[in-house]
């Protein structure tokens, strides 16, 4: 999911 992808974590810190 999103939180397993570093760029996605960086772009969505509120959900990760």
From Swiss-Prot:
Expressed by the venom duct. It comes from the Eukaryota. Keywords: Acetylcholine receptor inhibiting toxin, Amidation, Disulfide bond, Ion channel impairing toxin, Neurotoxin, Postsynaptic neurotoxin, Secreted, Toxin. The keyword NAD does not apply. The keyword DNA-binding does not apply. The cysteine framework is I (CC-C-C). Alpha4/7 pattern. This is Alpha-conotoxin Tx1C. It comes from Conus textile (Cloth-of-gold cone).
């Amino acid at each position: 999911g999103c939180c397993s992808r570093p760029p996605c974590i960086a772009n969505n810190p509120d959900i990760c």
